[in-house]
């Protein structure tokens, strides 16, 4: 009986810790009011979830979930990290001539553009991690040379979707 109580308390503690962890503001909140109505009116929103309008298979032909999971956990990959730091050149974004068109790629999907004097920032991730657990999914050396202090006023901010490697809460708040 004592053992079962300990197991129950451990499970309860894990549930509470996970719940509290998920209450952090960087996880967002459920849509309500006008925003929820706008979502419900989207042509992509059906049966309570967003769906692609075109057929978009989650797994390629000839594969199944078991083989994908097996490969993820037990397969060998030599492509996970570059052998050396990525070469990078830091552009002084604060001193760009307004008439100069510029594209600066920061890595993955993050980039800055200046076109006809307007500034655009796409999928900014400058906190050094693309995960709510900072010790996982860290930036590659060489792709982390910019901070939010390096940017001029941004005219347009684009977030392509709400994955951690495209939408960095700490960067957006800065």
Predicted regions mapped to residue ranges:
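Active-site metal-binding motif and surrounding structural segment of the metallo-beta-lactamase
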Residues: 135-174
């Amino acid at each position: 009986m004592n053992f079962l109580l300990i197991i129950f308390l451990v499970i309860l503690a894990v549930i509470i810790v996970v719940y509290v962890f998920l209450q952090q503001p960087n996880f967002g909140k459920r849509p309500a009011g006008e925003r929820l109505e706008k979502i419900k009116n989207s042509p992509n929103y059906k049966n309570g979830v967003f769906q692609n309008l075109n057929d978009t298979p989650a797994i390629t032909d000839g594969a199944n979930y078991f083989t994908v999971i097996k490969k993820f956990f037990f397969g060998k990959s030599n492509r996970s990290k570059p052998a050396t730091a990525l070469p990078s050149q830091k552009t002084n974004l604060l001193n760009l001539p307004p008439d100069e068109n510029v594209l600066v790629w920061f890595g993955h999907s993050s980039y800055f553009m200046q076109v006809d004097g307007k500034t655009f920032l796409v999928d900014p991730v400058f906190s050094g991690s693309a995960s709510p657990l900072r010790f996982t999914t860290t930036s590659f050396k060489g792709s982390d040379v910019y901070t939010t202090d390096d940017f001029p006023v941004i005219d347009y901010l684009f977030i392509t979707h709400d994955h951690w490697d495209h939408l960095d809460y700490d960067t957006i708040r800065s």
